[in-house]
């Protein structure tokens, strides 16, 4: 299954990715090994959970979880293009002891982190019941120093952030992973992405393998436009509807910033690029570059990719 996953990513539009793997150390390292050989650049997280999770994936206790996490980090240091990332599944699945421990490991090895935030109302309610002394979900991560500010941090979904939490996203330089298809499939809600972008918050796109039907980030870009129309129609008539420029930005520079100077053809940026031949798409007239990109967002055909580069290196499929 890992080979299928890696092959699918290689043939698609993605050059860099951050992944939630599994809660099993050896399996996570195997995925990292395969991604290391792919030519892509990636972060892969060992998913932490020691409570409120099925026994088949839950660690026996926080001590065992922390031991396995450090072993995974040390083993992963041998890789060059695939790096570890601290990955608590989300607050309800991690005890305070586990959160404290992985926070210390993050500091010890100077790692980024990733998790979920404000995906659905029941999850938020559970967090506020489990964690004492917090006013919102974000403060639960801040409590354990796993909410950016001093390190790169991805938070998936961010559907129900309060105004205060939106300010925290900006202040602490959080990277929001917008997963529109997942939010639809799980009936989670619609994130106010145009508000985030207009406030200068980092926003990239996620496929959310479990609740999404495709790994394609371009497909997610199209879906981001579509769900923003539903947000305008059913949630907030004052909200700005996303356009193709917003979507293309999130699919490139918006997510690329997490990896450094990535996602733009500017001087000093690393060369991640796709060579695309769209001449086979039937056309009744000539299109501008902007129109061709917008058309690509809606057609999303990997067969149009002629060549793919990551950090200047040709990806061989």
Q: How would you name each of these model-derived features?
A:
Residues 1-27, 88, 92-98:
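Divalent metal-binding segments
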Residues 270-317:
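C-terminal cap of metal-dependent C-N hydrolases
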Residues 143-149, 193-282:
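His/Asp/Glu-enriched, well-ordered alpha-helical/loop segment
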Residues 28-159:
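Metal-coordinating catalytic core of metallo-dependent amide/deamination hydrolases
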Residues 13, 35, 86, 116, ...:
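Divalent metal-coordination and catalytic microenvironments
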Residues 8-17, 80-85, 144-152, 173-177, ...:
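Short, surface-exposed connector motifs at secondary-structure boundaries
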Residues 47-50, 119, 180-185, 209-211:
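Short, acidic/turn-prone active-site loops that include or flank metal/cofactor-
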Residues 161-164, 170-201, 205-207:
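A conserved active-site cap/scaffold subdomain adjacent to cofactor or substrate pockets
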């Amino acid at each position: 299954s890992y080979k299928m996953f890696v092959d699918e990513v290689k043939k698609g539009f993605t050059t860099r990715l951050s992944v939630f793997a599994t809660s099993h150390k050896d399996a996570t390292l195997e995925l990292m090994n395969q991604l290391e050989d792919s030519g892509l650049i990636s972060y892969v997280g060992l998913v932490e959970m020691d409570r409120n999770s099925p026994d088949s994936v839950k660690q026996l206790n926080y001590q065992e979880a922390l031991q396995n996490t450090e072993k995974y980090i040390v083993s992963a240091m041998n890789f060059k293009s695939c790096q570890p990332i601290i990955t608590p599944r989300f607050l309800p699945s991690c005890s305070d002891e586990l959160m404290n421990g992985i926070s210390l490991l993050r500091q010890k090895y100077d790692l980024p982190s990733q998790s979920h935030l404000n995906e659905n109302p029941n999850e938020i309610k559970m967090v506020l019941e489990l964690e004492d002394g917090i006013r919102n979900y974000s403060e639960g991560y801040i409590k354990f120093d796993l909410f950016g500010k001093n390190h790169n941090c991805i938070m998936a979904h961010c559907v129900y952030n309060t105004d205060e939490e939106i300010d925290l996203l900006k202040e602490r330089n959080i990277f929001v992973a917008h997963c529109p298809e997942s939010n639809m499939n799980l009936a989670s809600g619609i994130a106010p992405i145009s508000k985030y972008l207009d406030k200068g918050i980092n926003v990239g796109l996620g496929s959310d393998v479990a609740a999404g039907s495709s790994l394609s980030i371009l497909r997610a870009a199209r879906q981001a436009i579509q769900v923003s129309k539903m947000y305008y129609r059913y949630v907030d008539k004052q909200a700005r509807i996303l356009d193709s420029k917003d979507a293309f930005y999130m699919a490139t520079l918006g997510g690329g910033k997490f990896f450094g100077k990535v996602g733009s053809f500017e001087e000093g940026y690393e060369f991640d690029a796709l060579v695309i031949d769209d001449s086979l798409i039937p056309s009744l007239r000539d299109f501008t570059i902007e129109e061709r990109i917008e058309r690509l967002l809606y057609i999303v055909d990997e067969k149009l990719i002629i060549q793919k580069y990551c950090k200047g290196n040709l990806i061989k499929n």
